[in-house]
Amino acid sequence: MAKRSKAYLAAAEKIDFDKLYSPLQAAKLAKETSSSKMDATVEVAVRLGVDPRKADQMVRGTVNLPHGTGKTARVIVFAVGEKAAEAEAAGADAVGAEDLIERIQGGWLDFDAAIATPDQMAKVGRIARVLGPRGLMPNPKTGTVTADVTKAVADIKGGKINFRVDKQANLHFVIGKASFDDAKLVENYGAALDEILRAKPSSAKGRYVKKVTVSTTTGPGIPVDPNRTRNLLEDADA
């Protein structure tokens, strides 16, 4: 196990790891226990009661965070002609087809999301092994394979995030920055949680949301009551 810094250990002392905090309490505590001098990112980890090895229990989706992530995502678009012009006008950070694929094959990965028009997907498939493991492969289910590149770019730049369960049945997503006020963090958390609950596979048995933790990138994970799905802005446990 990696050795923890003194700042991390001091922050961890403020947390009762045997307690399940309300989302609002966790948001406040995450900000208090951040050991970063920068504007730290606030993250959520969720353990689900699914078996990702089964195709019918793969949980994935998208959510438009009402207050964004605090970061303007870098978006690339695979498109040509008129659609390429639309993507550039919408604010895409890089637009292209073969040239963009070659850059990525050469090791360039300085972007947060990738969009493709349907006619470009056969070409983009050549770099699926590069993009897929990083969660960057365009997919119709997440709205990133589309002819409406203007909307897709605007959605992602505006705070749309993707979530996908990993092999250990965990989901990880961002809900904002430490500079956000507590209510905005909680409202972003609630929006994401609602989508995750809607994405519950019909074949999943038993408890669906098994564990939730909130933390900053460098801070300790704060255990959150997974049963708190309503009245999230209430401070008291209930």
UniProtKB/Swiss-Prot annotation:
Keywords: Repressor, Ribonucleoprotein, Ribosomal protein, RNA-binding, rRNA-binding, Translation regulation, tRNA-binding
KW Repressor (keyword) present: yes
Gene Ontology cellular component annotations, sorted alphabetically: large ribosomal subunit
InterPro entries, per the entry: Ribosom_uL1_bac-type (IPR005878), Ribosomal_uL1 (IPR002143), Ribosomal_uL1-like (IPR023674), Ribosomal_uL1/biogenesis (IPR028364), Ribosomal_uL1_3-a/b-sand (IPR016095), Ribosomal_uL1_CS (IPR023673)
Tagged with keyword Repressor: yes
Alphabetized SUPFAM superfamilies for the sequence: Ribosomal protein L1
GO molecular function, one term: structural constituent of ribosome
Gene Ontology process terms (BP): regulation of translation; translation
CDD domains according to UniProt: Ribosomal_L1
Region (Disordered): 219-238
PROSITE patterns: RIBOSOMAL_L1 (PS01199)
Biased composition regions of type Basic and acidic residues, renumbered to the chain: 227-238
Alphabetical list of Gene3D superfamilies matching this protein: 3.30.190.20, 3.40.50.790
PANTHER family to which the protein is assigned, alphabetical: 54S RIBOSOMAL PROTEIN L1, MITOCHONDRIAL (PTHR36427), LARGE RIBOSOMAL SUBUNIT PROTEIN UL1M (PTHR36427:SF3)
Biological role: Binds directly to 23S rRNA. The L1 stalk is quite mobile in the ribosome, and is involved in E site tRNA release. Protein L1 is also a translational repressor protein, it controls the translation of the L11 operon by binding to its mRNA.
Subunit structure: Part of the 50S ribosomal subunit.
Annotated NCBIfam families: rplA_bact
Record family assignment: Belongs to the universal ribosomal protein uL1 family.
Protein name: Large ribosomal subunit protein uL1
Lineage, uppermost ranks: Bacteria, Bacillati, Actinomycetota, Actinomycetes, Mycobacteriales
